[in-house]
């Protein structure tokens, strides 16, 4: 992964492709002038940030410099330009895993593609946990895929150190800041906010939720009020993979799309309008069967008792990953077809700041502001 010069003049800002961080962050596609490479530039208005926000950002930058792993998205450059903090990363041409399920795999991805994606994320998590941190924001939008099929975990902003005064703490109690978008992925013990606290096993629960998200095409507990979601999780409601083993046979005869699915909680699915226009009755999108290994993997991740969840290193040896025979960079581009990475851009920035002609059509599908690099 490239490193870049920490000088604003080295970057030609092309178009705004996202916003974030309480609308104080602008995400630009940019061209790195020395090489012509396309990059993502995250610009944060420091003058508008509160002291708490600045401290939060300092923690993120500290973590980014501390971590070095093939599956963690590195920051190519960080520097101050005028009143802005600039964070430069390589452009992820496949976008995030969430982008893929939102635009191409709306009823879920193939099991093998999910295995490659989760393996990359777990390798990153294993490293983060060994470094004494909890990620606290594992979800599909924070799993990015480069043009050559490599998997990167992002979202370092939410990482929390479990080391205090030189000693590793057994648990921590801090609730993630600015975490409203990540609530469906958070474990019961994080949401509970009690004296028992939580540890790195809370990330494993999030891996299980992310597995369901990738397989079902939507995150469990989707659109559920926060209070109800908390009650469901504390009462032991366990999401699952939607397939022939978890959906009643009579419901599989209905033509149902993910828009009618109810959060992957293995309850009744209401019928929706058939997808074909020629009068044929299409098959149910969840009329498929995931392997017992995949089901067991998810069940292990979503154990209510965090002590019963395997560690990231243990999960990497799970039978679910035995189906992987090649490197992700070799296999993922094939498994993601017909999706092709965004590698070419036409035109230049217009005077009315509307962006690059011909580019927005491609980029508008990417929820870049949710990548949180």
UniProtKB/Swiss-Prot annotation:
The keyword Ribosomal protein does not apply. Keywords: Cell cycle, Cytoplasm, Nucleus, Phosphoprotein. Residues 11-321 form the Protein kinase domain. Residues 255-281 have a biased composition (Polar residues). The modification Phosphothreonine is found at residue 361. Transmembrane segments: none annotated. One of its GO terms (cellular component) is serine/threonine protein kinase complex. Its main location: nucleus. CDD domains: PK_STRAD_alpha (cd08227). Residues 255-288 are annotated as: Disordered. It comes from the Eukaryota. PROSITE patterns: PROTEIN_KINASE_DOM. InterPro entries: Kinase-like_dom_sf, Prot_kinase_dom, STRAD_A/B-like. GO terms for biological process: activation of protein kinase activity; protein export from nucleus. GO terms for molecular function: ATP binding; protein kinase activator activity; protein kinase activity; protein serine/threonine kinase activator activity. It is found in: Nucleus; Cytoplasm. Pseudokinase which, in complex with CAB39/MO25 (CAB39/MO25alpha or CAB39L/MO25beta), binds to and activates STK11/LKB1. Adopts a closed conformation typical of active protein kinases and binds STK11/LKB1 as a pseudosubstrate, promoting conformational change of STK11/LKB1 in an active conformation. The protein kinase domain is predicted to be catalytically inactive. Belongs to the protein kinase superfamily. STE Ser/Thr protein kinase family. STE20 subfamily. Component of a trimeric complex composed of STK11/LKB1, STRAD (STRADA or STRADB) and CAB39/MO25 (CAB39/MO25alpha or CAB39L/MO25beta): the complex tethers STK11/LKB1 in the cytoplasm and stimulates its catalytic activity. This is STE20-related kinase adapter protein alpha. The gene is STRADA.
């Amino acid at each position: 992964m490239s490193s870049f010069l920490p000088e604003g003049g080295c970057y030609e800002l092309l178009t705004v492709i996202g916003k974030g961080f309480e609308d104080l962050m602008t995400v630009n596609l940019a061209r790195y002038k020395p090489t012509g490479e396309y990059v993502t530039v995250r610009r944060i208005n420091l003058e508008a940030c509160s002291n708490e926000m600045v401290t939060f950002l300092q923690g993120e930058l500290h973590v980014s410099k501390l971590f070095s792993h093939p599956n963690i998205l590195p920051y190519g450059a960080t520097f101050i330009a005028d009143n802005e903090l600039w964070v430069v990363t390589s452009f992820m041409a496949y976008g995030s895993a969430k982008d893929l399920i939102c635009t191409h795999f709306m009823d879920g991805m193939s099991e093998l593609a999910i295995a490659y994606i989760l393996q990359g994320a777990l390798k990153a998590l294993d490293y983060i946990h060994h470094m004494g941190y909890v990620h606290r924001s594992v979800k599909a939008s924070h799993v990015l895929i480069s043009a050559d099929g490599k998997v990167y975990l992002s979202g370092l902003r939410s990482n929390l150190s479990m080391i205090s005064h030189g000693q590793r703490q057994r648990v921590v109690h801090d609730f993630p800041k600015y975490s409203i978008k990540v609530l469906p992925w958070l474990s019961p013990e994080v949401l509970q906010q009690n004296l028992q606290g939580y540890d790195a096993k809370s990330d494993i629960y999030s891996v299980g939720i992310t597995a369901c998200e990738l397989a079902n095409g939507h995150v469990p507990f989707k659109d559920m009020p926060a209070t109800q979601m908390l009650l469901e999780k504390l009462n032991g409601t366990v999401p699952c993979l939607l397939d022939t083993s978890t959906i009643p046979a009579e419901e599989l005869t209905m033509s149902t799309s993910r828009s009618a699915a109810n959060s992957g909680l293995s309850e009744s699915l209401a019928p929706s309008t058939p997808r074909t226009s020629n009068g044929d009755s299409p098959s149910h999108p969840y009329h498929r069967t995931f392997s017992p290994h995949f089901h067991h993997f998810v069940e292990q991740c979503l154990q209510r008792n965090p002590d019963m969840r395997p560690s990231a290193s243990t999960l990497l040896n799970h039978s679910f990953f035995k189906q992987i025979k090649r490197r992700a960079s070799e296999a993922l581009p094939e498994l993601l077809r017909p999706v092709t990475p965004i590698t070419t851009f036409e035109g230049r920035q217009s005077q009315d700041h509307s962006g690059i002609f011909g580019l927005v059509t491609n980029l508008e599908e990417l929820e870049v502001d949710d990548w949180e690099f």
